[in-house]
Regions:
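Extracytoplasmic/secretory soluble proteins
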Residues: 8, 12-13, 20-527
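N-terminal secretory signal peptides that target proteins for export/translocation
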Residues: 1-4
């Protein structure tokens, strides 16, 4: 049975592309001003001054974020709570789901009807579509947003609200920052030099480095580089698809290709899995990686691995930390897909939703308005305490004092990214890593790919919820071992995965996805 959905009629593509996303703030898609943030009403400290909202009764709110609580987190949020108490007569308690546990525990918050109000979410990788299909998030009407978060409504681009819609309803407040979806690597520069490598700019280069590490008795990474691989093939995850979008891909580098690709029937996936088996057999990473509770950065920071794959900003953050603690490692950054044009993430790649069971939805939205548009709250959440963690340089820059207790943008503040008030870092003593980061970022900005209509598509699984749940329940028995090369026989394992997916209903999911995609493309064509 063919798992790749049939190609949609190419005529639907004409005029169907969404407006191009620029790599800077204020690309002309918003309703309000995206100019000088310090002159906006939100930036002037008037956010939250909503005369229509009743704040006479004190409420205690709870928000869930992703990651780990940093040492100074509670101290920082105590400062934020002082502002919230004064302006909104409420307090905010924050709980965390770690990187290692959010895949399993996120949905349990809703199935157990845990009492909380706000939660970080994101398309595909952080459970947005799946939670909406289960009824976990409160729908946010235009009137509700305008009433309780008027400043957010003025700032967030119209395109972002459109991307957040599922079946015509908005269920998250999307972030406003243009981010790149391509993964890069933070890599031990001393080892690259040892192996005679000046840079890693292609998949072949990356495999050469991994093999050199294995031959040298050093783990190259904490697992198989699946994202860099499918990105090297020009593919991207599909919003709302099973396994965080990774089970069904689309050819984002080719706007005329409207065929979804189920990985079990993709020859390149089979070849990748065999290559990963060869690598793990050679010792490129631990054979016990599936049982590890380590965070993604743990291997690099402890010296157990030679690299870490993540986004630009995160690789810079942990690369700097590694270099501060081990200067001789000379951690640098590389783009293993240097010659490919770059995809800009949709705005719903980060966001915040309100729990459908929240007893204080209005106050929760008002709190989010503060996080998103009040510069005092925004700076605290992103940078920490001024004078302890950072200091201001002019009106729109900051200089790091100490990141050990509260790292810059390392505390899941990404859900309310707002580039109209976000400070840029002033780097007094630039390092080679800073320069490499800027070089790669500039290269990304100068090589943005053409839009693909599916870049903004998000699959709604509610019509195939039984099949979707069955696929999600069965896939981990095969998927994680395969992408990390931890199987005895690749072909037999993929065949077994396909049989399990057949039984679970993967074809029903693909058929429904194909139907929705056809409607989505037709709707874009009309617009």
């Amino acid at each position: 049975m063919k798992k790749s959905t049939k190609k949609l009629v190419s005529v639907l593509l004409a005029s169907a592309m969404a407006a191009g996303m620029l790599a800077g703030c204020g690309s002309g898609n918003g309703k309000g001003s995206t100019g000088d943030s310090k002159s906006s009403s939100a930036a002037s400290g008037t956010s939250g001054d909503n005369l229509n909202a009743d704040t006479s009764e004190h409420v205690d709110l709870t928000m869930y974020l992703i990651g780990d609580r940093t040492p100074d987190f509670d101290e920082v949020y105590a400062k934020i709570n002082e502002i919230l108490e004064e302006k909104l007569n409420c307090s905010l308690n924050v709980e965390f789901l770690s990187w290692g546990e959010h895949d399993t525990k996120y949905s349990l918050l809703f199935s157990s009807q845990e009492d909380f109000d706000l939660i970080f979410t994101a398309s595909s990788w952080c459970h947005y579509e799946q939670t909406v299909s289960l009824g976990g998030f409160a729908p946010l009407s235009e009137d509700f947003i305008k009433t309780y978060a008027p400043d957010i409504w003025e700032v967030v681009p119209e395109m972002a609200w459109e991307q957040a819609k599922i079946d015509g309803q908005i269920y998250m407040v999307p972030n406003y920052a243009n981010e790149f979806g391509q993964e890069v690597l933070a890599v031990r520069g001393d080892l690259m030099e040892k192996y005679g490598m000046d840079d890693i700019t292609s998949w072949d280069d990356l495999m050469k480095f991994y093999k050199a590490c294995a031959a040298d008795g050093i783990y190259a990474s904490q697992g198989g580089p699946w994202y860099p691989f499918f990105q090297s093939q020009g593919y991207s995850t599909t919003g709302g698809a099973p396994k965080g979008g990774e089970l069904i891909l689309y050819h984002t580098q080719d706007p005329e290709d409207l065929e979804f690709q189920y990985i079990g029937e993709w020859d390149a996936f089979r070849e990748y899995c065999q290559e990963m088996k060869d690598l793990v057999d050679a010792g490129a990473w631990s054979s016990d990686v599936l049982n590890s509770s380590d965070e993604r950065q743990t291997g690099l920071l402890t010296g157990r691995t030679a690299s870490m794959s993540w986004n630009l900003g995160t690789c810079l953050t942990y690369g700097k930390q590694a270099n501060e603690e081990h200067p001789d490692w000379n951690v640098t950054m590389v783009d293993p897909n240097k010659n490919l044009s770059k995809k800009v993430n949709s705005y719903i790649n980060n966001g915040v939703a309100i729990n459908a069971n929240s007893k204080n939805k209005e106050r929760a939205m008002m709190v989010l308005n503060e996080f998103y548009t009040n510069p005092d709250v925004y700076d605290l959440a992103m940078l920490g305490i001024e004078g302890k963690h950072w200091e201001a340089v002019g009106d729109d820059q900051y200089k790091v004092i100490d990141e050990s207790g509260y790292g810059v943008a390392s505390n899941c503040n990404w859900g309310w990214n707002n580039c109209t008030i976000q400070r840029e870092e002033y780097i007094e003593n630039r390092t080679a890593l800073d320069d490499k980061y800027e070089s790669i970022k500039d290269a990304f900005n100068n090589n943005i790919k053409e839009d693909h209509v599916y870049d903004g598509f998000n699959f709604d699984s509610s019509n195939v919820s039984t099949q979707f749940a069955a696929v999600e329940a069965a896939i981990d028995n095969y998927y994680n071992p395969l992408i990390n090369g931890l199987v005895d026989d690749v072909d037999a394992s993929i065949d077994a995965m396909n049989a399990a997916m057949d039984s679970a209903g993967i074809q029903d999911i693909l058929d429904e996805m194909n139907r929705q995609a056809a409607e989505y493309v037709a709707e874009k064509e009309v617009k």
